[in-house]
UniProtKB/Swiss-Prot annotation:
Top-rank lineage group of the source organism: Eukaryota
InterPro entries: Arrestin-like_C (IPR014752), Arrestin-like_N (IPR011021), Arrestin_C-like (IPR011022), Arrestin_domain-protein (IPR050357), C2_dom (IPR000008), C2_domain_sf (IPR035892), Ig_E-set (IPR014756), SAM/pointed_sf (IPR013761)
Sorted UniProt keywords: Coiled coil
GO terms under cellular component: cytoplasm; cytosol; plasma membrane
Family: Belongs to the arrestin family.
Coiled-coil regions, chain positions: 616-647
Residue ranges constituting the C2 domain according to the UniProt record: 1-105
GO molecular function, one term: phosphatidylserine binding
The encoding gene: adcC
Protein name: Arrestin domain-containing protein C
């Protein structure tokens, strides 16, 4: 076996515990590997310190243990531990064989430590397909190969910059804001499918002239929680969105280390859109929120800003495994029957049939009910209940919940020596109508969720006849999108473009202009996340990029939108020219565009707001001047046309 030496560089920490006042700590790391121990410098008042501390360990074996412990330095008293973690050299060598030379180590309390490493001589790279995963994060505590999470090679996208934030602040807010942008979620909540990529964006709105950032850390996590305790991590991946500026290649700092976070990046005033991508393994579970059993997935973001307070954002996303949907539903028919003999004699039987036993929320269950009555009873109706039963852990007796009850009457009534076959339609509630209607679950030693229909034949003056029909609830097609009513959306479009919401802009494209290709053929469209106030400030070339999916209709859409924008801007410029900028808001509240402005008389202008007589008169005189100039131009154009016609007729006569 080849003997190899190892160098470790403790680069940085992230999301560490803040033990001092202000939620920060004076952070340093103690390292131990056999007889070798080392300590980094203390970085004060931080939860994301940068150390860049190099340690030459020397020769190591695959089973050599590396120990890291993070401390909060105290001037007086004992230093306080902030968490620890450990990893075997085999964990690092497996990454080196895949050309991965740095890893995040998860502390056993909160936060992470990032290290890089170098083996001498280096390991030969393993041959693997492009889909082969790379080592991303090492687990905490008793680290072993089984606690490692493997994620596909990170893909970084170039950020999009839109200079859309006006010089004046919005709602007197000068702080930088951020939020997640989920594609396809304008009209409804969009779920993500296991085995596919999560393609989203992080939107950073900068209101100051510029901000300076050290890092834009993004994480994607998912876990199973049972009775308040995490049972299993389903996904755990990380990105620094600043790597999008370099295509994912770390930038060497002054010390020669590949560490982008030590290089500050300036972000100008405007909207910065950072597209990102994570992968959900096909073995992950669907999102569930029960009292004792939860499967949750979160996107979390933290921006380390130099000249402003740091900002954070978190959003839960819905994940669906196709095994829990209509794509994997079983086509097992329902066929059950039972009978009884009343004391008064005769027999009553009931049978229920359906072509399948799997249904999704909102679907109609078509149940064929057949009743044969040879007794003296007169049967009028049948009662149907939908029950959900939750089994906790290994319990055999579950807790039952009634989700739906209904009564169906027989027409005509089933009298003695008669039979009736009737199709009963049971309308399952949607998930919005009944939050408790989740898909059927069977998680070993944790929870089991089952459903059944109780069909109760109501027999007068006798014990009712009951059938229990087990059914399976699955989730609907996760990729099916229900669009709203086009007429309603068009009717809700504000008169002013500047008042459009993001939803209004989508509705204008989809329904009013009837051009779905803008979104269908341009996957980047959703990343712009544009409202009316944004559209008012975009240059023409950006509008062409937004509408490029429209193909030959791109020019039409740009012209239509710009004409509406110009109608507003002309009114603003008109008032600014008269030094009446303070009246812009009053005019826009009355939705006065340029074409309407030129038709206003003095009384209408004066009634807009508490405008002074002098200002109203100045506006009215300016309107008259513009109308007069327009009339002169029109007369000149008419005279020019007449002159041209006379010249043509004169040439013909000659």
């Amino acid at each position: 076996m080849t003997q190899r030496s190892l160098k470790i560089n403790i680069i940085e920490g992230k999301d560490l515990k803040g033990l001092d006042s202000g939620g920060v700590s004076d952070c340093y790391v103690k390292f131990k590997c056999g007889p070798i121990s080392a300590k980094t410098e203390v970085i004060k008042k931080s939860t994301s310190p940068i150390w860049n501390y190099m340690i030459n360990i020397g020769n190591v074996e695959e089973n050599t243990l590396l120990q890291f412990e993070c401390f909060d330095w105290e001037r007086i008293g004992n230093n306080r531990t902030m968490g620890k973690t450990q990893a075997f050299v085999s964990d690092l060598s497996s990454g080196a064989k895949r050309n991965l030379m740095d890893q995040w180590l998860r502390l056993d309390t909160k936060g992470f430590i990032r290290i890089s490493y170098e083996f001498t001589p280096p390991y030969p790279l393993e041959t693997e397909s492009t889909n082969s995963p790379n080592l991303s994060v090492v687990g905490n505590g008793s680290s072993s190969s089984s606690s490692l999470m493997y994620n596909p090679t990170p893909v970084y996208f170039k950020p999009i910059f839109l200079p859309t934030i006006p010089s004046e602040t919005i709602n007197n807010n000068k702080s930088t804001t951020c939020h997640f942008l989920i594609p396809g979620s304008v009209y409804q909540t969009r779920p993500f499918v296991c085995g596919e990529f999560v393609n989203c964006s992080l939107v950073l709105n900068v209101f100051e002239a510029r901000i300076v950032v050290r890092s834009l850390n993004l994480s994607f996590s998912g876990s199973i929680t049972y009775k308040g305790k995490k049972q299993r991590k389903l996904v755990n991946d990380y990105r620094d969105l600043l790597l999008g500026f370099t295509g994912g290649v770390p930038v060497p700092n002054n010390n020669g280390n590949n560490n982008l976070t030590s290089n500050k990046v300036v972000l100008e005033r405007g909207k910065h859109v950072f597209p990102f991508q994570f992968f959900i393994d096909k073995t992950c579970k669907s999102t569930v929120n029960l009292t004792d059993y939860k499967v949750n997935y979160y996107l979390s973001f933290h921006a380390d800003i130099v000249n402003q307070p740091d900002i954070s954002a978190s959003q839960e996303i819905k994940v669906v495994n196709l095994e829990d949907t209509v794509y994997k539903q079983t086509i097992s028919p329902i066929n059950a029957q039972t009978s009884k003999s009343p004391l008064t004699g005769g027999n009553i039987s009931i049978s229920c049939k359906s072509v399948k036993n799997s249904f999704y929320p909102g679907e109609e269950i078509e149940l064929e009910v057949e009743v044969n009555n040879s007794s003296k009873k007169k049967i009028k109706n049948v009662d149907i209940q939908l029950n959900k039963v939750e089994y906790d852990g290994t319990d055999v007796t579950g807790t039952s919940y009634q989700l739906l009850t209904m009564t169906k009457k027989f027409y005509p009534k089933i009298k003695q020596n008669t039979a009736c076959k009737q199709m009963v339609v049971i309308e399952l509630p949607s998930t919005t109508q009944c939050v408790g209607l989740i898909h059927s679950i069977a998680e070993t030693k944790m929870i089991r969720v089952e459903y059944h229909l109780l069909v109760n034949l109501d027999i007068p003056s006798c014990v009712d006849l009951r059938l229990k029909l087990p059914i399976t609830i699955v989730q609907p097609d996760p990729k099916f999108e229900t669009l709203p009513n086009p007429l309603t959306e068009i009717g809700n479009l504000p008169r002013y473009v500047k008042d459009w919401s993001i939803k209004n802009f989508h509705s204008w494209v989809l329904f009013k202009k009837q051009c779905p290709d803008v979104m269908a053929l341009n996957p980047e469209f959703y990343q712009y996340n544009l409202s009316g106030s944004d559209l008012m400030q975009l240059p023409t070339e950006t509008l062409y990029s937004i509408f490029k999916g429209a193909g030959p209709r791109t020019q039409e859409l740009v012209n239509d939108l710009q004409s509406q924008i110009f109608e507003i801007k002309l009114v603003r410029n008109f008032l600014k020219e008269l030094q009446l900028s303070n009246l812009i808001d009053y005019f826009e509240k009355q939705t006065i565009t340029w074409d309407i402005l030129l038709q206003l008389n003095y009384n209408e202008i004066f009634s807009i707001t508490d405008i002074t007589i002098g200002d109203a008169k100045r506006i009215f005189l300016k309107i008259q001047q513009i109308q007069s100039e327009r009339q002169k131009q029109q007369e000149q154009q008419e005279q020019q046309v007449v002159s041209n016609l006379e010249a043509v007729s004169l040439q013909k006569s000659e």
